[in-house]
């Protein structure tokens, strides 16, 4: 496969774990007893690679270990995919930057979330805005409509009608017509996402969210990712999270993490085997800088961002 050849040619120590290409055409039709009958078709193209290399560090956490990473591109249309050269370069760099990781010291520092990690955070956040969690009293955002729950610069919405985006749809899984919905406006929670059942429980109308989000959009800011990193004298660039320490009922947030340490505004050594911790409430208020470059490979459309203080538990 050409992508595999391009990637392995960049660094002799790399070995391919998987390279793939897929294309898909799907058709959705919904009919119900209320007389609704409609449908639509959509396409999806995806190409990617994951690679592995041995970590030859003689000291530190990675001694004798293998490091793996990769990159992929997904889009509704084939001509919107990233070039194979770009995918190969990112897969190579993302893997090599993990070599020789150390464990950071325990501290409180700013954390820059890569777009992928921003997406993970917003996915958890959005579940707290779903009506089924709210009426079951399993959301830290219960009874918070109209209140300031986040930094006033945050604008978050669900946008089902965006052209070419992966979460776009004309109706939800109950046949309710999809319309744009503002969730957070100037930091205030203004809507929940409701199915018909959840809406009835909360004495509200369905917002067309049976089946979950469509395209969840965090409005971009003005900073490049490099500028976000430059804004931090001593902190973390977060590239990976693991574990299940997320509680949308209480708002507690604790995840295993990997990343790169930021020193004097520049990426320094890789770090791993530590946890980051805070609460959703604090993180939303402390999310103070938002990037400009949106990752469109997922229905959660978000740029990277900075949270100005989180706890790091390391050595």
List each language-model region with its residue ranges.
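Active-site bordering "gate/hinge" segments
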Residues: 1-169, 176, 185-188, 266, ...
